[in-house]
Swiss-Prot record:
Species of the source: Photorhabdus laumondii subsp. laumondii (strain DSM 15139 / CIP 105565 / TT01)
Enzyme class (EC, first level): transferase
Biological processes per GO annotation: selenocysteine biosynthetic process
CDD domains for this protein: SelD
Chain segments annotated as transmembrane: none
Keywords assigned by UniProt, alphabetized: ATP-binding, Kinase, Magnesium, Metal-binding, Nucleotide-binding, Selenium, Transferase
Record: residues binding ATP: 19, 47-49, 67, 90, 138-140
Quaternary structure, from the entry: Homodimer.
Family: Belongs to the selenophosphate synthase 1 family. Class I subfamily.
HAMAP family on file: SelD (MF_00625)
Highest taxon listed in the record's lineage: Bacteria
Residues that hold Mg(2+) according to the record: 50, 90, 226
Protein name listed in UniProt: Selenide, water dikinase
Amino acid sequence: MSTEVRLTQYSHGAGCGCKISPKVLETILHSEQEKFLDPHLLVGNETRDDAAVYDIGNGTGIISTTDFFMPIVDDPFDFGRIAATNAISDIYAMGGKPIMAIAILGWPIDKLAPEIARKVIEGGRAACKEAGIVLAGGHSIDAPEPIFGLAVTGIVNIDRVKQNSAAKVGSQLFLTKPLGIGVLTTAEKKGLLLPEHQGIAIETMCRLNKLGMDFAEVAGITAMTDVTGFGLLGHLSEICAGSGVQATLHFAKVPKLPEVESYIAKGCVPGGTGRNFDSYGHLIGEMTELQRKLLCDPQTSGGLLLAVLPEAMDEVKAIARCHGIELTAIGELSEQQSGRVLIEVNE
């Protein structure tokens, strides 16, 4: 769908790249105030997981999450689809099934027509329909910049919850979507994106991570998270810190969007990349400039990052193949050693 309005001109950030940096977020969330503890809350924010999980009895957990951001593309319908797909992904990343969503909309009503906002909502509704859920309501405010996202509710068998803090030594790492979304969308804004690469990032961002529901059945997947605004290294460092392991990443094996290296060489690097490295670069071993700029690239609606025990690798690859995805191990986890960085990157 084409539009005369370029939504990205009305926002200072783009997609998950407009997230508050991990370093600043740590300051915001740190509190000396005594926390209210609820024994039924199985997953909270202690390990920066993708969603909260609450035990409602009978072996069932309710998953609750929210995600919203400013436009990463100009087309309002695509913006709505991408934002909704990204929000729903958190449910899949926990191994859950989404059941309902409500919309979050901020709109500069003095700058952008309400008809454009309607197209954004329609895009969000389309993504919800593809996920098999209803967009049941929402809340809107007059805001200086366009913002859209969802609060999503899901369900999960509490014995099958996948967390980012339970990875085991010896697990192999897999990523279900290629990296470079931030790079390609930046290239498009700069007018440098080649015609043959038009739409690739949008297609990737709009692909639901439904296979997370199937991965929930695999006991050998010891940790799972989705890769979004903090980049691959940021989310992998959360797995390592929460699980007490360290990782070795093989850069050549990491899936990448077409020609992403050449776009990086042309300066198509979003601002979030530097903020990410500033926040967790001290946890990473030596890298080349190319490795740093791609592995810290903020992803919007990125893929699932899995830690898989060797005996479950064939089953995981078969599940992915049923969803049209060929998986290759991109690294492995080992025992965390004192004084060592959490992640080593090699060629």
